[in-house]
Amino acid sequence: MHETSYKPIHRLSPDTAKKIAAGEVIERPASVVRELLENALDAGATKIHLEINAGGCALIRVSDNGHGMSPQDLLLCAEAHTTSKISSADDLLQLRTLGFRGEALASIAAVSRLHLTSTRSGPLAWHYQPKAAGTAAHVPPVPQGTEAGVLEPASLERGTVVRVEQLFENFPARKRFLGRQSAETTLCRSALIDVSLAHHPVEFRFTVDGTHKLTLLSQQTRKDRCLETQMLKGDPALFHTIEGGDCSFHFHLVLSEPAICRRERRGIFTFVNGRRIFDYGLVQALVLGSEGYFPNGTFPVACLFLTVNSERIDFNIHPAKKEVHLQDYAHIRHTLSRSVAHFYRQCTIAHYVRAEPAHAPATQGNAPTHSSPPCTGVREEPAAPCAHTPRYESLFPLPVQHAHLLPPSPPHISCEHARDCTHPAPAAEGDAPVHNHTHTGAFKVLGQVAGTFIAVERNNALYLIDQHAAHERIIFDTLQRNLGTAQILLIPYHIHPRSDEEARIMHRACTELSPAGFRFHEEPDGSWHVTAVPLHWRGSEEQLAHDILYSGKNAHDILRHVLATCACRSACKDGTILDDATLHSLVEQAFALPQSRCPHGRPIWIVIGRDELFKRIKRT
C-alpha cells in the first residue's frame, strides 16, 4: 500500500479559496458570458451588446440599458454572497430572477481583471475595479475608495458596462484546458443564442475582435426568434407553435412538421423559466409524443419553453443552473407527450386533407361547409389560467366535409390475407378496374406497380400506396385495439438472460408487456417462460427475445417497439402479388386509417394531383 507522509490540516488563503470556488461557476469564457447576460436581463435590459476578443480570454464586454447600480451597489456587487435578488433562504421558493446566489461577479473577479461602470440616471456614473485575486489592494484618493478595490467617477448615459480582462491569467490550471480561440468564440456565441431564445423581446448584438457578427432584433414571438437564430432551420411554414398547461405550469412549444427531422435529439432545445437546461426526461417526452411520425430513427426539431410556478421548482442544485427539480415532473412530461402526439395527428389529418384536389366534389352533400382561413402565422397570447387543453394556433384548417374520411374504428383485415395471396386468380380479358364507393369515398384501384405500390385513382388524383406500410399500419392498429386479449401457446417460448443487466431488462419488460397480452413466468434458474402472446401476434421465440433484450429500447418504449416489429414482420412484403379482392380491402382500410404513416414513421402513400400530372406531361 502506498504510504504518504503526514500533513497537518491548515486553512487555505482567501485568494486560493476564491479561485477554487470560482472554478465551480466559471468554467470557461462562455460561463462568464452567460452570467453577465443573465445579470443584464435581471436588470430589466431591453438592449444588450456582447463583445469578445481572443475567444473571450483577452476581453469580454457586456453593455446593457438596464436600471444600473448605485455607488453603494458597486462596492458590494463583487463580494461573495452579495445580491439584490433574495434576502433569505425562504426567497428561494419564490424566485423571479435568473440569478440569486450572489456568486457570479465575485467568481469572475477571482479569476480575471473586472471593471464595472454603471449609473442609475446618467450621464453621471461610477467606475469600479475590484481588487484582483493575488494582488495588493489599491486605495484611491476618493471617499468611496475601499480596500476591496477602486471606485471613481465616470460617464455613462444608461445601464451598466462590465469588462472582464485577462480571464484565467492568474489561474493557469484552468486556462490550460481551454480550447482554441475559434472554439471558445463559438461557445460564447452559443451562450448568447441560448439566452436570446428565452427572451425574444430583447435585442442582442454580438461583436468578435472588433467585427460585428450578429444582431438579433426584438421579436414578437418565440418562433420568430428561433428562426432568426437559425436554431430551427427550414421552411418557416413547417414550424408551428403549441401552447398548453394548467394552473401550475404553462408551455410554448415551437415544433416542426415531420418533413423536417434530425438524426439525433440535439435538435430539441429545452428552456425552463427563462434558462436553457439539459433534461433527458423533457426531451424524451417530446420524442415519445412524436413516435410513429418520424421514420428510420429520426427526431423532430423543437424548442420547448416551459414556465413553472416558482414554488414548484428548484434551480439550486447545479453550480451553473443547468439542471432543475420539478415538483410535478411526471404530470408535465405526460402533458407534453400527449400534446405533441395530438399535434402530429392533426398534422397528418391536415396533410391528408390538403392532398385532396380543391375541385373534388364532397360526398356529404347535406353537410355544412365551414372553411377555416389559411394559416397566416403564429400568434402568441398570454396563457389563460387553468387551461388544461393545449391550444394550436391556426395550424391546420380542416373543413367539415372531410370529417367522414376518418371513421373511429376501421374494419379488420386478416394478418394472413394479404401475405398469403401470392397466386391471384387470372383476370378475364378486358376486365376494367373495379370502382368502389364506401364510407372512405369513391376510389378506383388501377393495379400494382413493381410489386410494391398500389396505384389508385381518387378525387381526380393519383395515389401510390406502399402496400407493406399500409398493411403494417393496419396490423399495428389492430394489435393496439386488442391489447390484453391473449392466445395461449401450446409450446411456451423460453428466454434465457445471459447477464444481470439482461435479467433486469426482462423484469421491466414483463411489467410493460403484460397489459398487451403477454404472460411471463420466471423459473428458479433465472430463465423465463412466455406462456401467452397477444391475439394477433405473428412473431417467433427468437424474435421476441431479440426485441426485448437487444433492441436497446427502454421500458416505456418496449411495448410499442414489440408491436411495431410484429406488425412489420406480419405485413405483406415487397414483391407480393395481391388479388383484386385483397387490393380493394387493403386500399379501403388504408384510406380509413387515423393517420397515413406506418408505425416507424414512413408515409403510407404519396399523392400526385391532376394539376401536377398535367404539368409533368406539359399539358395545359
From Swiss-Prot:
<protein>
    <recommendedName>
        <fullName>DNA mismatch repair protein MutL</fullName>
    </recommendedName>
</protein>
<dbReference type="InterPro" id="IPR002099">
    <property type="entry name" value="MutL/Mlh/PMS"/>
</dbReference>
<dbReference type="GO" id="GO:0030983">
    <property type="term" value="F:mismatched DNA binding"/>
</dbReference>
<keyword id="KW-0227">DNA damage</keyword>
<dbReference type="GO" id="GO:0006298">
    <property type="term" value="P:mismatch repair"/>
</dbReference>
<keyword id="KW-0234">DNA repair</keyword>
<comment type="similarity">
    <text>Belongs to the DNA mismatch repair MutL/HexB family.</text>
</comment>
<dbReference type="GO" id="GO:0032300">
    <property type="term" value="C:mismatch repair complex"/>
</dbReference>
<feature type="region of interest" description="Disordered">
    <location>
        <begin position="360"/>
        <end position="382"/>
    </location>
</feature>
<dbReference type="InterPro" id="IPR038973">
    <property type="entry name" value="MutL/Mlh/Pms-like"/>
</dbReference>
<dbReference type="GO" id="GO:0140664">
    <property type="term" value="F:ATP-dependent DNA damage sensor activity"/>
</dbReference>
<dbReference type="Pfam" id="PF13589">
    <property type="entry name" value="HATPase_c_3"/>
</dbReference>
<dbReference type="InterPro" id="IPR037198">
    <property type="entry name" value="MutL_C_sf"/>
</dbReference>
<dbReference type="InterPro" id="IPR014762">
    <property type="entry name" value="DNA_mismatch_repair_CS"/>
</dbReference>
<comment type="function">
    <text>This protein is involved in the repair of mismatches in DNA. It is required for dam-dependent methyl-directed DNA mismatch repair. May act as a 'molecular matchmaker', a protein that promotes the formation of a stable complex between two or more DNA-binding proteins in an ATP-dependent manner without itself being part of a final effector complex.</text>
</comment>
<dbReference type="InterPro" id="IPR020667">
    <property type="entry name" value="DNA_mismatch_repair_MutL"/>
</dbReference>
<dbReference type="InterPro" id="IPR014790">
    <property type="entry name" value="MutL_C"/>
</dbReference>
<dbReference type="InterPro" id="IPR042120">
    <property type="entry name" value="MutL_C_dimsub"/>
</dbReference>
<dbReference type="InterPro" id="IPR013507">
    <property type="entry name" value="DNA_mismatch_S5_2-like"/>
</dbReference>
<dbReference type="Pfam" id="PF01119">
    <property type="entry name" value="DNA_mis_repair"/>
</dbReference>
<dbReference type="GO" id="GO:0005524">
    <property type="term" value="F:ATP binding"/>
</dbReference>
<dbReference type="GO" id="GO:0016887">
    <property type="term" value="F:ATP hydrolysis activity"/>
</dbReference>
<dbReference type="InterPro" id="IPR020568">
    <property type="entry name" value="Ribosomal_Su5_D2-typ_SF"/>
</dbReference>
<dbReference type="Pfam" id="PF08676">
    <property type="entry name" value="MutL_C"/>
</dbReference>
<dbReference type="InterPro" id="IPR036890">
    <property type="entry name" value="HATPase_C_sf"/>
</dbReference>
<dbReference type="InterPro" id="IPR042121">
    <property type="entry name" value="MutL_C_regsub"/>
</dbReference>
<dbReference type="InterPro" id="IPR014721">
    <property type="entry name" value="Ribsml_uS5_D2-typ_fold_subgr"/>
</dbReference>
<feature type="compositionally biased region" description="Polar residues">
    <location>
        <begin position="363"/>
        <end position="374"/>
    </location>
</feature>
